[in-house]
UniProtKB/Swiss-Prot annotation:
InterPro entries: Arginosuc_syn_C, Arginosuc_syn_N, Arginosuc_synth, Arginosuc_synth_CS, Arginosuc_synth_type_1_subfam, AS_cat/multimer_dom_body, Rossmann-like_a/b/a_fold
Protein name: Argininosuccinate synthase
Originating species: Frankia casuarinae (strain DSM 45818 / CECT 9043 / HFP020203 / CcI3)
Family: Belongs to the argininosuccinate synthase family. Type 1 subfamily.
Location within or outside the cell: Cytoplasm
């Protein structure tokens, strides 16, 4: 019988309801664990106290902002991680760090199970449970919201009946998840894919249609990782936080996506990720300047697969580790600066430079000083086109 459970606690509706459900259904003590991944908003001490009010025997808050940035966001930047070519894995990246701390807390507090507040329709249930299986296969997992069949309306009623201090109602039923890397919103009117998202859904970004004076930022990279902004060296967490404000002020990073979930359904998601889109745009441009052509071409496929397996909850997998090794090798030398203009919802690259640049002005220029010997082109074309020429001659011979 489960005697102690560590619950991944967010302070929201589902996990607050989960505390009461676990106690009622299993009789186990609940240790609530809230992991700070830069979500901001409500004070974490208030969240800690809420867990105790909802019935947890212990409530813990872990500051994982730097860890999240350095160990999870940085690899995503190096991998140009965009699921379906658009979504920068906001929630997908935070779940593995939460899992890491859940497992550590379970060991510290003698728990034999962990729990999460995910529904059966989402991706996070997979990310939590597969992550726990990879790090601590002996731990069992409880999913009270999913396994009790509790709908959102029922969860709201459960919270209201027991006087749980949750700020949610049937009139404003958005489900929000946010962290340093961005913000997600779903449910409510957003479930109609034809409905335009109300402006009050957006928090990280201003209306991009409102004219503003453009801003310009210069982002410094070393080996594919952002290390500075406008000539100032910054820890990655601080750099991302500042860019969220500056790029968000110009409406950068709003994404309205019909998303293919891992569980097989399509969902409508609203994302805000000003810093993520700005940094990924800058990083990809710097790669164009510094990576050899064949490496760059091959890496695009690696990047896509990297994003897919992270989205699918396989952060702690052998394939992910193997892909990381390639990305780390390819990223050596992706160093330099990228200048970005922020205006009208767009992060536009307007300049880039690198000590490892493969751009050779003397070869690229059409002006005086051109060192490219155009006479070499004739022989190159002859050899490059030779297989096609031989094939065409055969076709004419066989099909006159």
């Amino acid at each position: 019988m489960t005697e102690r459970v560590v619950l991944a606690y967010s302070g929201g509706l589902d996990t607050s309801v989960a505390i009461g459900w676990i106690g009622a259904e299993t009789g186990a003590d609940v240790v609530a664990l809230a992991v700070d991944v830069g979500q901001g908003g409500e004070d974490l001490e208030a969240i800690r106290q809420r867990a105790l009010t909802c019935g947890a025997v212990e409530s813990i808050v872990v500051d994982a902002r730097e860890e999240f940035a350095e160990s999870f966001v940085a690899p995503a930047i190096k991998s140009n991680a965009l699921y379906m070519d658009r979504y920068p894995l906001i929630s997908s990246l935070s779940r593995p760090v939460i899992v890491r701390h859940l497992v550590a807390a379970a060991r510290e507090h003698g728990a034999d199970a962990i729990a999460h507040g995910c529904t059966g329709k989402g991706n996070d249930q997979v990310r939590f449970e597969v992550g726990v299986a990879a790090l601590a296969p002996g731990l069992s997992v409880l999913a009270p919201v999913r396994d009790s069949g509790m709908t959102r309306d029922k969860a709201i009623a459960f919270a209201e009946e027991r006087g749980l201090p949750i700020d949610v109602s049937k009139k404003s039923p958005y489900s929000i998840d946010q962290n340093l890397w961005g913000r997600t919103a779903e449910c409510g009117v957003l479930e109609d894919p034809w409905a335009q998202p109300p402006e009050d859904v957006f928090v990280y970004s201003a209306d991009p249609t409102v004219a503003r004076i453009p801003d310009e930022v210069t982002i410094s990279f070393i080996d594919g990782v952002p290390v500075g902004l406008d000539g100032r060296s910054l820890p990655l967490a601080d750099l991302v936080a500042e860019l969220n404000v500056r790029a968000g002020a110009h409406g950068v990073g709003r994404i309205d996506l019909i998303e293919d979930r891992l569980v097989g359904i399509k969902s409508r998601e609203i994302y805000e990720c000003p810093a993520a889109i700005t940094l990924l745009t800058a990083h990809r441009d710097l790669e164009d300047l510094t990576l050899e052509r064949d490496v760059a071409r091959f890496k695009r496929g690696i990047d896509q697969r990297w994003g897919e397996i992270v989205y699918d909850g396989l952060w702690y997998s052998p394939l992910k580790s193997a892909l990381d090794a390639f990305v780390d090798s390819a990223s050596a030398g992706v160093s330099g600066e990228v200048r970005i203009r922020l205006v009208g919802g767009v992060a536009q690259v307007v300049g880039r430079r690198s000590p490892a640049s493969l751009y050779d002005h003397a070869l690229a220029t059409y002006d005086a000083g051109d060192q490219f010997d155009q006479r070499d082109a004739r022989g190159f074309i002859e050899l490059w086109g030779l297989p096609t020429k031989v094939w065409a001659a055969r076709e004419q011979r066989l099909n006159p």
